[in-house]
Amino acid sequence: MDTTDELLALEHEGWRSLCEGTGDTFYGELMTEDGAMVLADGSVFDRDAVIASLDQAPTWDTYELTGVRRIDTGPDSAALVYTGRAHRGDEPPFEARMASTYRYTGGRWRLALYQQTPLP
């Protein structure tokens, strides 16, 4: 499995965890200790805040990732950039450009930074 496939598999695992209500556990294990998420509303969460917010977060029904591309950011890091679309009940779909930056450390890929930019 190449790097793009490995990172995309992690992205899908993360989205599935958000659909299943286990995002707090998944991202608690995936994120680096100093990791952060920058959300569509402008909030910036450190790892502990991500875990706490996902503990009670409503689940998504479905999701899709399109336009995925990998950007190498260093010898032990890479980012995936894509468009994500998620659906929940009768709400309008959430759609944003997303970037996940990973660092290879301790023998595995860890999420260092995740960022969302909502689409109009």
What name fits each language-model region?
Residues M1-E29, D34-P120:
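A beta-strand edge to alpha-helix "cap/lid" segment located at domain peripheries
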